[in-house]
A protein has these predicted regions:
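A cross-taxon signal for low-complexity, glycine/charged-rich
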Residues: 3, 16-43, 47-48, 701-704, ...
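Long, compositionally biased low-complexity repeat segments characteristic
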Residues: 3-11
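Generic short N-terminal amphipathic or hydrophobic helices
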Residues: 10, 23, 47-48, 690, ...
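Glycoside hydrolase catalytic-domain context in secreted enzymes
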Residues: 54-702, 707, 711-778, 786-802
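Short beta-strand elements
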Residues: 802-815
Length: 815
């Protein structure tokens, strides 16, 4: 097991003894009492002491087992319940206190963990004013932790869990681009740095577990949570996810979400069933989790709400035991998603009552019930009814206690509150958020209008997402101080390169068109237009929410068209946005269209009519400053799509690796913009592709128990890339493999390597990839992962559409 860096080596804290109430007499008796020994010579005494030390070491009980043996059934059940915590405190001005709800719960069922104490958003009803700022957060969690340590029988410290999909979801923290934007960077090193910041901000405030990254493979853009994912490909998602995990786990535990196949729900409905067989699961939807566990060292995993072929993921022994524990050798803690254990009974109807639901989840390996309802309220009943054994309960408790020991919580469970005030949400962290936003921007079209030249002296900025900070931040975002967020219009104005005018034009969803005429007026007077459209995952305090926190679509009309619970039946821009676009394009001025979006929306009209087209996804707190740098050429965009942009919703699902098919009657079967696509202000040329057998060597990219031979390198792929354009820039080099004939229908191609590299104009660089047996393997239920003899086509280029002129191909044969 890879041991976490002890967070207390990073954050100095108070020193307490959480085990002070334990009976230590048994430990003293393990090796005998030195004071009772009578020793008559130095040599003999030395021998006796050495013998005693060895005897003590041999007999010393594992601390987890020692503690477990002292626990009552109620105390064990408490370790497995993780209730929602944002109502566990009160705040009035500078006064802060632990709520009676928490104290009462600890009296009846001493909790092992708590979720979302620091969460602030409309669901929690916490605002910038009523929520907790970093110093208050650290104070509160120290207070709650102190109560657990000093006022419960065994003094077991708690785990505090927080949401961290693109920054800690709390007031005053750093807000990065959402997952789909992070994936557009194709930059593992950058995302590891981001993970360090996210984990550090969580730990500085007293929490220990960050929920994220989200590694669901998203292949249905109607689904409301595409924005949280790393896109459609498991190799890209797993590589980037492992990097984020490694960054986060320098300070906290990362939680991989959501195991498994949550991103392909029937009809695009959140939490709907996934109809997929074991072969496709293993090849398409599970490798991202495997890589983040095996290569990234992830310590915790969260199950998903959905069923797979009718079996709830939180009740799947095949998924949580055979695959997760046995095949991937996972040793950590498994959380359910919020109320997912109860869903086994309440909505999936696989259990007759909450106690049976608790039993089903516990027996297959769900260690902690997020929400706590079933394990906290019904696990004891399940034991009494013979649905579980105490050994089943002990197994889960053992996992939880071991994680607490690994985190160092029994040595020091507290944090230095002053550091939270000074080191959360820093200017340096904001600069990193800007860098992620810059690298995530994908240029989809450019007829030469970008970057803006000296002739662009007056710019009209128009659109519903041009000056709305929450629309650019995405779901799972806390309320913000406006001074900490740079909107699109603010970034452009702050650039100071042109006179700037602004009109909203319309809202994202509202049908009011009263402001369109003003938008047309300022567009006519400008040298160029920046038209900022798209969607929004901005929650507000009028929206209704389910018990899980998912938004409920109702008659209330906000800008929100995306985010958990907001599934779509079309991908069209809503409200009057298309009318606004038509009116602006008809003027004939140069138009740069910018999409702020959480899912791939319909871009056909914009791609046809715009002079330039960008997607920034949800770019986070520095999105406006990033856009301005790109518009004026201070940064050369090089983001690449991690998900295909469909031409219409009728193509869905459309993804790069699906077996080739014929066209539709109405349109091409190809996406509007393919996976891996993105333009630059410069051009690159590929040449000199060489493939040669590599010397046998261990290659640590996915050693899985029983399959260590898969780590052997089979061949080396090298080629040269040259920047033949007029400016320096990044290129994302992509390597794809196609198995020409296999016992299971092969994908049309699969990504097996990528590098984001910077090349100065006129310069060349040699790029090398190593392909392993796993890269060329096929999975079958009967044989597992194995390489079959035959031909493989190797393709390299700047996009998954490797039939373009920039791509190179070659074949290798495996005998």
């Amino acid at each position: 097991m890879t041991r976490l860096h002890n967070p207390l080596t990073v954050i100095a804290g108070l020193t307490r003894d959480p085990l002070r109430n334990r009976d230590t007499s048994s430990r003293l008796g393990d090796g005998g009492s030195l004071s009772a020994m009578t020793v008559k010579s130095v040599s003999v005494s030395f021998l006796v002491i050495v013998c005693l030390l060895f005897s003590s070491c041999a007999k010393k009980q594992d601390p987890v087992e020692s503690l477990l043996s002292k626990m009552t059934l109620e105390e064990k059940c408490g370790q497995l319940a993780c209730p929602i915590g944002f109502n566990f405190y009160g705040k009035d001005g500078d006064s802060l206190w632990v709520a009676d709800d928490f104290l009462g719960m600890m009296d009846t069922l001493p909790l092992g963990s708590c979720w979302a104490v620091l969460r602030a958003d409309p669901w929690s009803k916490k605002t910038v004013e009523t929520g907790l700022h970093p110093l208050e957060s650290a104070r509160l969690l120290n207070m709650m932790q102190r109560h657990a340590v000093e006022n419960t029988r065994l003094g077991i410290p708690m785990l505090f869990c927080e949401e961290t999909p693109h920054g800690h979801m709390a007031v005053g923290t750093t807000v990065f681009p959402t997952g789909i934007g992070q994936a557009s960077t194709w930059d593992p090193a950058l995302l590891e740095q981001m993970g360090v910041v996210m984990g550090r901000e969580v730990r500085l405030q007293g929490a220990h577990i960050g929920y994220g990254p989200v590694l669901d493979i998203a292949r249905d853009p109607r689904w409301s949570r595409v924005e949280e994912t790393m896109g459609e490909d498991s190799f890209l998602s797993g590589t980037l996810g492992a990097a984020i995990v490694q960054g986060m786990q320098k300070n906290v535990c990362a939680t991989l979400k959501h195991l498994a196949a949550y991103g392909i729900p029937q009809g695009g409905h959140n939490a709907a069933t996934a109809e997929v067989g074991p072969n496709r699961l293993m090849t398409d939807y599970l490798p991202s989790f495997e890589k983040a566990i095996v290569a990234g060292g992830a310590k915790t995993v969260m199950t998903s709400y959905n069923t797979i072929d009718g079996v709830p993921c939180s009740a799947s022994g095949w998924l949580l035991q055979e695959v997760l524990r046995n095949s991937w050798d996972f040793k950590g803690v498994v959380f359910s998603d919020l109320n997912a254990v109860n869903a086994i009974y309440a909505t999936q109807h696989v259990a007759v009552d909450p106690a049976e639901a608790a039993a089903l989840a516990l027996k297959v390996g769900v260690d902690i019930d997020l929400g706590g309802y079933n394990y906290g309220g019904f696990l004891k009943e399940a034991l009494q009814r013979g649905l579980v054994t105490e050994a089943d309960i002990d197994r889960a408790v053992r996992h939880v206690l071991q994680l607490k020991y690994d985190l160092g919580l029994f040595d020091n469970p507290y944090v230095d509150e002053a550091l939270a005030e000074s080191e959360v949400g820093t200017a340096e962290s904001a600069q990193l958020a800007k860098q992620v936003a810059l690298e995530s921007a994908v240029l989809l079209k450019n007829d030469g209008i970008l970057p803006f030249g000296e002739n662009i002296k007056k710019v009209a900025v128009i659109g519903p997402n041009a000056d709305n900070m929450y629309n650019q931040l995405g779901d799972y975002t806390a309320p913000q101080d406006p001074d900490r967020v740079v909107t699109m219009i603010e970034g452009i104005r702050d650039k100071g390169r042109a006179e700037v005018t602004y009109a909203k034009g319309c809202a994202v969803r509202d049908e009011n068109d009263a402001d369109i005429e003003e938008a047309v007026r300022i567009a006519k007077a400008a040298d160029a237009v920046v038209l900022v459209v798209g969607g929004s995952s901005a929650r507000d305090f009028k929206t209704s929410y389910e018990e899980t926190g998912a938004a409920i679509v109702d008659e209330h009309l906000s800008d929100m068209d995306c985010g958990e619970g907001y599934d779509r039946s079309t991908l069209k821009l809503l409200g009057k946005q298309e009318e606004l676009m038509q009116r602006i394009y008809a003027i004939g001025k140069p138009v740069v269209t910018v999409y702020i979006q959480g899912r791939p929306l319909d871009m056909n009209f914009a791609a046809e009519q715009s002079n330039a087209l960008l997607t920034l996804w949800y770019p986070g707190m520095e999105g406006g400053s990033a856009l301005a740098d790109i518009l004026w050429g201070d940064y050369n965009p090089a983001g690449r799509l991690p998900i295909s942009i469909p031409r219409s919703v009728g193509q869905v699902p459309v993804y790069y690796s699906q077996p080739q098919t014929g066209d539709y009657v109405e349109e091409s079967a190809k996406p509007l913009f393919p996976f891996g696509y993105g333009l630059s202000y410069t051009q690159f040329e590929y040449s000199d592709l060489q493939i040669e057998p590599a010397k046998a060597m261990s290659f640590q990219r996915g050693n899985v128990r029983g399959r260590e031979s898969m780590a052997d390198t089979l061949c080396k792929v090298s080629f040269t890339i040259k920047n033949i354009g007029l400016c320096d820039g990044d290129e994302v080099v992509q390597l794809y493999v196609r198995d020409e004939v296999a016992s299971v229908t092969p994908a049309s191609k699969l990504l097996k390597g990528f590098q984001r590299i910077h090349i100065n104009k006129g310069e060349s660089q040699q790029v090398t990839f190593y392909l392993t047996e796993r890269d060329l393997s096929v999975y079958s239920k009967e044989k597992g992962w194995h390489v079959e003899p035959g031909d493989f086509t190797i393709m390299v280029g700047g996009c998954s559409d490797v039939n373009n002129g920039d791509a190179m191909k070659s074949k290798i044969q495996r005998s």
